[in-house]
């Protein structure tokens, strides 16, 4: 199969019929074989009923329904797990991403042998203060910290080679940083393409200042995880051992000072330096334990269930 279209959504029932028809009109005009996978991330409107109707009328359309809202990253993860196309394209369900971009993204990723292409909404139809300015600040910080020079990390429309999305773990709120995750997995051929951004036609935006703040926190988390996520003992163990050694050395010095030098001086327990040394040793021990627990968590995380699927219109493996 040439293409898998992955569409995560939350309360977008009004948009789905138009979006689905638009995708079909664009792709039926090509010779590409494709599938469309909607992931309902715990919608409370009629989104799932609309997906069931689309599935009944088009055999290449599928749906996955979460038992509750788990977040966009988990929705993408579920879609990626089911995708079988050589190229996987993601887009949002709010009609602000134009399906007319899909054929061009497919042609370019194949022709230029890219690992992924990220969309760039160069001209936006969003609030200047509440979305455009925060988005520019966020993307600037992401570029500086990751070394990947994309203009729009959070753009919903992206195209990936299948091996890319099968090789990375999208977790937490890391959907914004899939290009960074891909680069750290060795997929460095990253392209960017200006895409059309349209004004929202139905519903209301899910964006808010809290998501903007979370984006920066996730960036810090990602930076740490990329360095130490698979080996937390390297970070916590090093600093824990260093702090314990410093604290122990200080306590040893105080003991030698009392026994051989300041014999008539204050008791060790009366000196504040002793409690500083003791605290440093305790913190070092706690850091070391944190590293050990982190190693246990890393070993177990692949066996944990990250989301619950309530219904599926596609065999889930």
Question: Residue locations for each model-derived region?
Answer:
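Acceptor/aglycone-binding surface of glycosyltransferases and processive sugar-polymer synthases
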Residues: 53, 62-68, 72-82, 87, ...
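Short beta-strand/loop segment that forms part of the nucleotide-sugar
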Residues: 20, 32-43, 64-65
